Regions:
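Alpha-helix C-terminal capping segments
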Residues: 9-21, 128-135, 220-228
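A short, small-residue-rich loop immediately preceding and capping a beta-strand
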Residues: 1-12, 18-27, 111-120, 143
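Glycine-rich phosphate/pyrophosphate-binding loop at beta-loop-alpha junctions
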Residues: 92-177, 240-253
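Active-site-adjacent helical/loop segments in soluble small-molecule enzymes
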Residues: 173-230
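Short glycine/serine/threonine-rich phosphate/pyrophosphate-binding segments
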Residues: 4-11, 120-127, 214-220, 243-244
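Active-site-proximal loop->helix
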Residues: 9-56, 150-162
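Small/polar-residue-rich loop-to-helix segments that shape phosphate-bearing ligand pockets
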Residues: 29-107, 178-191, 196-197
Length: 253
């Protein structure tokens, strides 16, 4: 993933718990990062992960992961290659498994709106598969933070369908997904409105919102309210506390 990827840190933590070695292929060059590396990478390194800076763009990482796995096999090891963001049907199951908890919290609120940030598409795909399995009727808005919405939509729906098949649940329909294009100035780059909303969440509710996913999803929520949405809105917080702390530290400096 990228240096600010939530998945980079999560993968390192999971590997440590499972007693697995973890090689993380990171886009970009280490020399171009600030002296204090993003906390996401610091957390991953602190968990014992091997950080491999590729010098490549994010879009090239999946191919590089496969090449790295081939080299490990040639050394007699048994790698389990995972694409960026954990975007596989198995990777999406985590979000699908979380839907029943949300359903319990939203009992009686069938008209609720759920807003989920998405990068690789795995989280949103899992949510859609879990929503279908639960028979929920909430309207779902995905907020695409890294890829143009028309491009990522088909990938999300295909991944959701494959995840639904693993659950032996009903199919995910195209109409189940409303997708907001929030790439803006780029992945992890915020508009002035996004920055204001980060501060608003912190000052009014004490909520840390990261710059990569949460800030853009929060902007989408406030846009819905401004457009007249009156149903209960749930913002699914995508994590990213290390990146949020990095952003706040930079603002303080």
């Amino acid at each position: 993933g990228s240096p600010s990827s939530n998945f980079v840190a999560a993968a390192a933590l999971a590997a440590r718990v499972c007693g697995l070695d973890c090689d993380l292929l990171v886009s970009g060059n280490r020399a171009l990062l600030p002296a204090d590396v993003p906390l996401t990478l610091g957390l991953a390194g602190g968990c014992g992960a091997n950080l491999c800076f590729t010098g490549a763009d994010r879009e090239e990482l999946d191919g590089l992961v496969d090449e790295h796995a081939d080299r490990l096999r040639a050394e007699g090891r048994r790698p389990y290659p995972v694409p960026r963001g954990g975007a596989t049907p198995v990777g999406a199951l985590g979000f699908a498994a979380a839907v029943p908890e949300l359903a319990a919290q939203l009992a009686g609120l069938d008209d609720a709106v759920v807003v989920v940030p998405t990068g690789s598409g795995a989280s949103l795909a899992g949510f859609l598969a879990g929503r279908a399995a639960a028979g929920a009727t909430w309207r779902t808005y995905g907020v695409s933070v890294s890829r143009p919405a028309p491009r990522i939509r088909a990938e999300i729906l295909a991944l959701a369908g494959r995840c639904a098949a693993l659950l032996h649940g009903p199919a995910v329909r195209d109409a189940d997904l409303n997708l907001v294009d929030a790439v803006g100035p780029g992945f992890g780059r915020l508009t002035d409105a996004d920055l204001r909303h980060v501060r608003l969440a912190l000052d009014s509710e004490g909520i840390l919102v990261d710059p990569t996913y949460g800030a853009k999803a929060l902007t989408a929520v406030l846009d819905l309210v401004a457009a007249g949405e009156r149903a209960p809105i749930v913002l699914w917080h995508g994590g990213g506390v290390p990146a949020a702390l990095t952003l706040l530290a930079g603002g303080a400096a």
